[in-house]
């Protein structure tokens, strides 16, 4: 294995300092491959907080460069600052919460060398700590590894080619960057990367998670033209089908109950049909595709899943209506 000089960039806020300390403690074998750690911490608005974050430098023998800001800065800007301050040829990213596998960097370097790549995108897996978290994760992320910025290892010249992160978004900047990277360097997306583990939802209740879900979806960087067209097509199909159902017995069967074309309760049938399609896809097919063991759920747990899924879908609809262009 060829020696590589790697900078680890971590963005955080002061409120998450205890999680940042836990992350640094659990870098384990990954430290062998790191030349420096760049921590960008915002919300450091007092002298005592400055003292507290500087104690991070004493946790490891490796060079830890701490950059602090009084105001809270967005995740994209935090990463951009870390990139500019980094000194080495390769950059890898972590966030405060997901914890990396102890052989994460070794595994990623192996993939780079075997496939002659300039970078690999990170992956993350969500692990619940209670039944509510299990239902929420099953309704959203699922249990298959999903691509993400944390865990990414990339050559700096490729990063410069792809471009930096959108600095002023509270969320969605990572999705935008991944979409951009897929166009410029699709080989960044590789199977076999050891995923970071996101254990639990850090004590957030359902209301907090709904607010975060709305914030993420309303700021999510998507292709608004294609997404709007898809919504338009589905809406057009459903509306036309319902209008046809409402007028079928009137226009086709002339309300003659003896007619071959008369369909009793056709409106209720069509509404029930679309509801059934939604239910089967959203509550069964989609979770299975995300490696959720849906058939292991008991009745109460399944009802919770249905409730959470419907609420989140309504939030997603509202977020789409209010989508920030």
Which residues does each PLM region occupy?
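Glycine-rich, basic loop-to-helix element that forms the pyrophosphate-binding segment
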Residues: 69-86
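Catalytic donor/gating beta->alpha subdomain of glycosyltransferases that bind UDP-sugars
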Residues: 166-170, 175-227
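Membrane-embedded multi-pass helical conduit in multi-pass membrane proteins
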Residues: 236-321
């Amino acid at each position: 294995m060829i020696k590589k000089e790697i900078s680890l960039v971590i963005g955080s806020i002061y409120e998450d300092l205890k999680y940042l300390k836990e992350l640094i403690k659990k870098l384990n074998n990954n430290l062998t491959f790191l030349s420096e750690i760049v921590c960008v911490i915002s919300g450091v608005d007092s002298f005592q907080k400055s003292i507290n974050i500087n104690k991070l430098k004493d946790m490891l023998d490796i060079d830890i460069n701490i950059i602090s800001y009084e105001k809270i800065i967005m995740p994209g800007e935090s990463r951009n600052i870390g990139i500019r301050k980094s000194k080495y040829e390769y950059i890898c990213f972590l966030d405060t919460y997901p914890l990396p596998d102890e052989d994460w960097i070794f595994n990623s370097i192996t993939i780079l060398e075997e496939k002659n790549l300039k970078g690999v995108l990170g992956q993350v897996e969500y692990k619940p700590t209670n039944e509510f978290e299990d239902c929420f994760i099953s309704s959203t992320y699922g249990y298959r590894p999903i691509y993400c910025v944390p865990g990414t290892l990339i050559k700096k010249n490729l990063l410069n080619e792809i471009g930096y992160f959108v600095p002023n978004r509270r969320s969605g900047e990572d999705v935008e960057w991944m979409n951009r990277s897929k166009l410029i360097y699709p080989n960044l997306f590789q199977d076999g990367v050891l995923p970071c583990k996101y254990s639990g939802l850090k004590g957030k209740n359902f209301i907090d998670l709904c607010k975060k879900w709305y914030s993420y979806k309303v700021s999510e960087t998507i292709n608004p033209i294609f997404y709007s067209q898809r919504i338009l097509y589905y809406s057009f199909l459903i509306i036309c089908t319902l209008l046809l159902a409402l007028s079928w017995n009137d226009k086709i069967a002339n309300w003659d109950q003896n007619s071959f074309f008369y369909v009793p309760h056709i409106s209720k049938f069509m509404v029930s049909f679309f509801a059934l399609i939604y239910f089967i896809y959203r509550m069964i097919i989609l979770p299975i595709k995300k490696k959720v063991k849906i058939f292991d759920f008991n009745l109460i747990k399944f009802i919770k899943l249905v409730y959470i899924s419907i609420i989140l879908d309504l939030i997603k609809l509202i977020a789409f209506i209010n989508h920030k262009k």
